[in-house]
C-alpha cells in the first residue's frame, strides 16, 4: 500500500513521516525544492508469524506500507502546472492530510479546505483536458457523459469520492488516478496537552460534512 503525506509548511508533516518510518528526513528543509521523501515499513502480523513458525519458510514476508512525504503546500495554486508532482501523487493509494493545530492562531479547517481544493483543481484540469480531446474524437459518448458528471461535481468544489459509480464507470475512471477519489486520513497535529482528547464538535462536523 502506498500512502502520501501532504500538508502546509510547518504542519509537522515530515515529523510524522519520520515517526512512521524511523527515518531522519530533514524537517523544514525543502527550501522551495520539489524533493520527495520516501520510506517503507513492514506491517507486523501475528498470523504471518504463526504461519512462519508452522511452515518454517526460508523467508518470512510481511505486508509493506510505502510512505511518500510530498513537498509542503502553500496555496491553492501549488499543483497547477506541476505535472511531475501531480503524477507522483496519483500513484499513491491513499492520502494522509497533516494539519497544523498546535498554535493559537492555527486554522486547521482552512488548511483542510486548501488541501482538498488543490486536489479538486488538479482533477478538474485533467477532466477538462480529457473532455477537450473527446470532443474532437466524437466516439466515446459514455466517457463524455461520465466526465461531464465529474466536471460538474468538481466545479462545485466537491470531491469525486462523494459520487457513486457503476462498474462500467469504474473501468473508465481507473486510469485517471483522481486525487479527490482517494481515501483520506486527516491528522490534526496538536500539542501534548490535547493528547487523547476527542476532536472538537466543529472539527467532527466539518469532517462529517465532507464525508471524511
Regions found by a protein language model. Give the residues of each.
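Conserved G1/Walker A P-loop phosphate-binding module
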Residues: 1-104, 108-109, 116, 127
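C-terminal-of-GTPase-core extension/linker across diverse P-loop GTPases
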Residues: 2-7, 11-17, 21, 133-212
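Class I S-adenosyl-L-methionine
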Residues: 52, 128, 204-208
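G-domain G4 guanine-recognition motif of GTPases
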Residues: 70, 96-104, 110, 118, ...
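A short, gly/pro- and small-residue-rich
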Residues: 108-119, 204-206
Amino acid at each position: 500500500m502506498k500512502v502520501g503525506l501532504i500538508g502546509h509548511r510547518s504542519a509537522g508533516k515530515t515529523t510524522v513521516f519520520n515517526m512512521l518510518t524511523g527515518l531522519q528526513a530533514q524537517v523544514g528543509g525543502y527550501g522551495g525544492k520539489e524533493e520527495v521523501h520516501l520510506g517503507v515499513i513492514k506491517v507486523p502480523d501475528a498470523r504471518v508469524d504463526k504461519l512462519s513458525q508452522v511452515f518454517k519458510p526460508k523467508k518470512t514476508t510481511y505486508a509493506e506500507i510505502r510512505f511518500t512525504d510530498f513537498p509542503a503546500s502553500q496555496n491553492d495554486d501549488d499543483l497547477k502546472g506541476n505535472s511531475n508532482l501531480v503524477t507522483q501523487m496519483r500513484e499513491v493509494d491513499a492520502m494522509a492530510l497533516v494539519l497544523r493545530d498546535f498554535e493559537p492562531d492555527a486554522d486547521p479547517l482552512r488548511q483542510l479546505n486548501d488541501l482538498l481544493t488543490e486536489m479538486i483543481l488538479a482533477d478538474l484540469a485533467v477532466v477538462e483536458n480529457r473532455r477537450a480531446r473527446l470532443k474532437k474524437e466524437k466516439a466515446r459518448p459514455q466517457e463524455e457523459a461520465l466526465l461531464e458528471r465529474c466536471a460538474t461535481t468538481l466545479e462545485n468544489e466537491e470531491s469525486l469520492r462523494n459520487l457513486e459509480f457503476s462498474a462500467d464507470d469504474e473501468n473508465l475512471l481507473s486510469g485517471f488516478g483522481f486525487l479527490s477519489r482517494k481515501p483520506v486520513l486527516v491528522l490534526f497535529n496538536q500539542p501534548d496537552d490535547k493528547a487523547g482528547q476527542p476532536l472538537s464538535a466543529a472539527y467532527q462536523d466539518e469532517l462529517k460534512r465532507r464525508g471524511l
